[in-house]
Amino acid sequence: MDWKEAIPGAAKVAIETKDYITYSTLLELILEEARIKDIDEQRELIKCLHEELKQEKNDHITREISWDIIGMVLPYVGKVQNEADEFVDFLAKNGNPREVFLKCCELLINGGFESPQQFISLNSAILSALHRISTKRPVLFVNNFLISLFSGLANILQIDSDELYCVWKISISSIQDAMHRFPVSECYLACLKACSILAQLFLSKETLMLSFRSLLQTKDQYAEFREELSGATTNCDKLDTLSKSIINIFDYLLSHLPESWSIITEHMAQELTKATYVSQSSSISSEDEEIAKNADVPAEVDNNSTKADDKRDEIEFDTKGCLALLTIKSFYQSGNFFLDFLKEKFPSTILETLQQLVSWEIQLDSVGFKDIAVYQGYLLDLPHFQVPDSELEHLSSLLHGYHFMASSTELPWLRVTCNAIVTKCLDSQLPSVRLSYILDTLEECPLLNIKTAILNYYQKQCSLVKDSNEEGLKNFVSPNTLLDVFKVFDAMEDVELDSQSLSYIHQTLVFLYSLEIQNLLSQNQFPTVYFTKISDQINNYEGELPTDGLKYYIELLNSRNK
């Protein structure tokens, strides 16, 4: 088909007959065929079509079918750069705004993007149309747009791309534009909910490293890791820019929407009070997604319409996103809005609430939320938090959660921060609390790397006994306590050496030797069964694993116990 003649000729016929459907069908055929042509011919086609519809005589055609052409041109966006983007922008600005709005929302929801640029182009088109729509019920349009935005965003995040920064940027500015386009309370509330959804999606993909950056600001025993891991935060600058933009919108809404703080904290309190937690795989619920798929252009309704109709296309808060907003806001603004929320809604069960919350976040695949979980511990100032007896069990569960996170991650910076918060928190507790946690971990924890870490901590505590006047600390090396620990060693069945068990066994031998040189061991207390198992296994693995360190400590212990 010779489209150079067909396009203007068919346009003339369409004007005369007002048969815009036939003209639209012709353009669809031409654009579909051109998708297999070379890039130069595609570019020439898009430019030709753009120039044709820009002519004043074709204004009516443009207004009538722009919404349809956008869908036809979208596959060229990201391929025929500039020309396709400019054409979509022209169609959005000159087509019927309501029809353009509907079509672009539909395309966002359907997904199937080949590049992030298609997502960005559609969002720009929607906002262009939204600014030309006059309505008495703006919240209907805003809610439909936000549902479409997050459906499209969830789809585009499945694509591996270096352009995600631009995707986040346009998503943030889209919420901001919608907020300023219709500055009324109903739209403000919708945008407040949108902030929570965006925060949830953002942290499901990105990591702000708030916990590690907080650790770097301290001067403690973990400072030695600064030089080794100093490059870990090099990518945080761009993410900080995005995060601060989200928080700026959040703050604006908090200041302009009456009772907004109460609305968001009450929602979070209700969700946290529930016994179960449903993890969402996307930013909107299945009900909202179904609404989005079937959404029509919001028609003007008379004043007798019920409020129930308004809720048909309403987005909802994302609880994880709400909590993340308060946490991130606390980091950038040197406040503690997260702790303010806990004190306001859970004054007597702060630790229990944090333990429950962290247990949820730890189970998520997202490193971003794991980082948030650890930073929330810093916000609570766990190392100096006065733990009542009624919450000691929750403290233990919380620390076990952080320990589990440290053992299961391959990220050095996250492992460092998790272990740091556990150690610093234990140091601030009474010796009885510390000892209880140590024994519980050694007896019950199935993960050898966690048992290795806690045994190392126990060894350091034992070394403090001699120079300490603290009565409770002496229980760390009492005969009964050591007997319990050695029973754990002896109960270790089927000792087979591998990378993890090697570290644990090495730590047990170092621990025994440290007790021996402090004259805290006797023949009656020595874990003979365990020691014999280890000695036998080392001989079996001769040459297969680096066992020289184990042999060294076994020889030392043998010589001192003869």
Swiss-Prot record:
Subcellular location field: Cytoplasm; Nucleus
GO molecular function, one term: ubiquitin-protein transferase inhibitor activity
Chief localization: cytoplasm
Keywords carried by this UniProt record: Cytoplasm, Nucleus, Phosphoprotein
One GO cellular component term: nucleus
Database matches in InterPro entries: Glomulin/ALF4, YAP-bd/ALF4/Glomulin
Highest taxon of source: Eukaryota
Modified residues (Phosphoserine): 285-286
Listed GO biological process terms: regulation of proteasomal ubiquitin-dependent protein catabolic process
Coiled-coil regions, chain positions: none
Region (Disordered): 288-308
Family: Belongs to the UPF0649 family.
UniProt name for this protein: UPF0649 protein C1442.02
